[in-house]
Amino acid sequence: MIKRYLQFVKPYKYRIFATIIVGIIKFGIPMLIPLLIKYAIDGVINNHALTTDEKVHHLTIAIGIALFIFVIVRPPIEFIRQYLAQWTSNKILYDIRKKLYNHLQALSARFYANNQVGQVISRVINDVEQTKDFILTGLMNIWLDCITIIIALSIMFFLDVKLTLAALFIFPFYILTVYVFFGRLRKLTRERSQALAEVQGFLHERVQGISVVKSFAIEDNEAKNFDKKNANFLTRALKHTRWNAYSFATINTVTDIGPIIVIGVGAYLAISGSITVGTLAAFVGYLELLFGPLRRLVASFTTLTQSFASMDRVFQLIDEDYDIKNGVGAQPIEIKQGRIDIYHVNFQYNDNEAPILKDINLSIEKGETVAFVGMSGGGKSTLINLIPRFYDVTSGQILIDGHNIKDFLTGSLRNQIGLVQQDNILFSDTVKENILLGRPTATDEEVVEVAKVANAHDFIMNLPQGYDTEVGERGVKLSGGQKQRLSIARIFLNNPPILILDEATSALDLESESIIQEALDVLSKDRTTLIVAHRLSTITHADKIVVIENGHIVETGTHRELIAKQGAYEHLYSIQNL
């Protein structure tokens, strides 16, 4: 896991190295203070060979040098170190999020059907951000603390070996304590992160569906459901907090014993004349430079457990396999005719579930309008979703212009199929930007032209800022009919040879339906058009009507032929016209 993460770090290794070098200088400067104290006591105050004026002169020079180092030299070093560390870590997170976003766009509809959007967002935002601590702490601060400890110990050994050995007495207990607590903390951190993601997933769903909550007046019930998720997170968080508190209390106790031992031994040596008072004072100063980093290392280990848990979750997402892959030798094939042939297609969402489609065979000619009808759950929309490869067939094959759709590059295939759905998604951007999704390189004139053809231009011009009006999240500021017209406009802009209308007008009032049906009639002209519809009155003009029941095609023909047949279609039509 760490090795994989380091692949993102590798392009910035020289900056990290520079950050560590600058950090060594930054942390090395405070180590002069204990030596300054020793010099002031032993070299000046207790130096009876110097006169008072000489003592003041020597002390003034020493303090002047110290002030120059701490006031003039250290601040820019501190700035450079902080800037380098933050720039590098944020750039690495930028690369990770970029990779994750591209990965998410490549994942199939099956992944999104099986995972809460809120949890996915939590991994991309929260978990990636949490891994920043691995860069700042694991790759920078830990090394700086270790180097600080080594430098401090070297100076302490130089000052007095016995006192240094006394300081090292607690090290074995320190290492044992860290070892005991670290593994447990990592497990608890992973559990806490998962619980937080569940809270975020629940919250995301309920906020998106707040109209349902309010319409059924189930606020109290949903508050209880949220409280269950929130309470589970609280339980996990408190377990983590309790264990974290145990570790800090134990390790701080161990590191507090060290200075007490050193002061006791040092005082005895000073009384006996083995060391000077200045040496003892310097040693006490170095104790904080020794045990301070040791305490920070414990905090670093705690931080790293959280970072590793988040790293696990990030790579779980990165390792999510693609259901829909470009086949070997896939090409950006141009669809020239738009003929579709479906041979012996079977489909099931999961291996342990019953088939949704069973031995589907169908041919659709160039420019033909074909409608798919039947009871809900029969498999109409599922069949439609197989053509742009939102899902792959379980068995059988689908051909377009004689080419297996798996021979197309996925992006090339989908770019040549226009899809208008019942609830089209608009992004929280301007009207113009939402239309440009059809072809981002289109000109303003082309945007206006397709809006006119889609019967959208007039209502757009009545909006506060016209084409520059923000539509809100999912187009919340627009009516259903207005959103549908914008979605049709972007299909016009893309101008695909194949068009799929999946319940495109079923949720609209009669006036909106009439306006949109007019636009759809223009849109479907000279294109192979597939329509999924519940309102049979909207598809009587179709060249072919396909009736699907329980995953089987049970009837095929024109409206007149099927009415005359008095079968499944005639039964559905009669029910709707009672």
Curated annotation (Swiss-Prot):
Sites where the protein binds ATP: 374-381
Record-annotated ABC transporter domain positions: 340-575
Family matches, as Pfam families: ABC_membrane (PF00664), ABC_tran (PF00005)
Keywords: ATP-binding, Cell membrane, Membrane, Nucleotide-binding, Translocase, Transmembrane, Transmembrane helix, Transport
One of the record's GO cellular component terms: plasma membrane
CDD domains: ABC_6TM_Sav1866_like (cd18554), ABCC_MsbA (cd03251)
UniProt-annotated location(s): Cell membrane
Keyword rRNA-binding (UniProt): no
GO molecular function: ABC-type oligopeptide transporter activity; ATP binding; ATP hydrolysis activity
Domain ABC transmembrane type-1: 16-306
Topological type in the membrane: Multi-pass membrane protein
InterPro entries per record: AAA+_ATPase (IPR003593), ABC1_TM_dom (IPR011527), ABC1_TM_sf (IPR036640), ABC_transporter-like_ATP-bd (IPR003439), ABC_transporter-like_CS (IPR017871), P-loop_NTPase (IPR027417), Type_1_exporter (IPR039421)
Family matches, as SMART domains: AAA
Similarity-based family: Belongs to the ABC transporter superfamily.
Entry domain remark: The ATP-binding domain (NBD) and the transmembrane domain (TMD) are fused.
Complex and partners: Homodimer.
Name of the protein in its database record: Putative multidrug export ATP-binding/permease protein SAB1799c
Organism annotation: Staphylococcus aureus (strain bovine RF122 / ET3-1)
